[in-house]
Structure formats: structure tokens, C-alpha cells
């Protein structure tokens, strides 16, 4: 089974249409990976589906980087 980090990065690549080499743990979804507000909503939905969890809107707004998403998933699954 892939690690949480690998799974999150795979989803980021798929949702944002970026290469795996562009996705670092410190990458900002908006500033570094070019996500807009719709992209971030779709990204959160994909993470919720993959990890079978719900990410409340107020928490989703705090997920600014790849590492933020990884940390949230690890803490809540």
C-alpha cells in the first residue's frame, strides 16, 4: 500500500495536472502549483474520497501546501 504522502501527491498531480517532479511537500497549491479556488475544492473532494474522510470547510481553507494536506490526513484517518 502506498504511503499517505505518495497518495496525496498522486491526487495533487491528477487534480492539478502537474508533473510529480513539480510536487514537493512545501509546494503551495495556489502559488507553486497554479490552483484556483475551484481546483482547491476539487482537490479536497478527491482527498476526502481517497481517504474516506470528511474535511470541514474551515479545515480545508487551512490546507495551503502539500504537507498541510498530508498532516491533516494522517491526523484524521
UniProtKB/Swiss-Prot annotation:
Listed InterPro entries: ACP (IPR003231), ACP-like_sf (IPR036736), PP-bd_ACP (IPR009081), Ppantetheine_attach_site (IPR006162)
Modified positions (O-(pantetheine 4'-phosphoryl)serine) in chain numbering: 37
GO terms, biological process: lipid A biosynthetic process
GO molecular function, one term: acyl binding
Post-translational modification (record): 4'-phosphopantetheine is transferred from CoA to a specific serine of apo-ACP by AcpS. This modification is essential for activity because fatty acids are bound in thioester linkage to the sulfhydryl of the prosthetic group.
Domain Carrier, chain residue ranges per copy: 2-77
SUPFAM superfamilies the record matches: ACP-like (SSF47336)
Subcellular location: Cytoplasm
Keywords from the UniProt entry: Cytoplasm, Fatty acid biosynthesis, Fatty acid metabolism, Lipid biosynthesis, Lipid metabolism, Phosphopantetheine, Phosphoprotein
Pathway terms, separated by semicolons: Lipid metabolism; fatty acid biosynthesis
Cellular component, GO annotation: cytosol; membrane
Stated name of the protein: Acyl carrier protein
Organism encoding this protein: Marinobacter nauticus (strain ATCC 700491 / DSM 11845 / VT8) (Marinobacter aquaeolei)
High-level lineage: Bacteria, Pseudomonadati, Pseudomonadota, Gammaproteobacteria, Pseudomonadales
Amino acid at each position: 500500500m502506498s504511503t499517505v504522502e505518495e497518495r496525496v501527491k498522486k491526487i495533487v498531480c491528477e487534480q492539478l495536472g502537474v508533473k510529480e517532479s513539480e510536487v514537493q511537500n512545501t509546494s503551495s497549491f495556489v502559488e507553486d502549483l497554479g490552483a484556483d479556488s475551484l481546483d482547491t475544492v476539487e482537490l479536497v473532494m478527491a482527498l476526502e474520497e481517497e481517504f474516506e474522510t470528511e474535511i470541514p470547510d474551515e479545515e480545508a481553507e487551512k490546507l495551503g501546501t502539500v504537507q498541510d494536506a498530508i498532516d491533516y490526513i494522517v491526523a484524521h484517518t
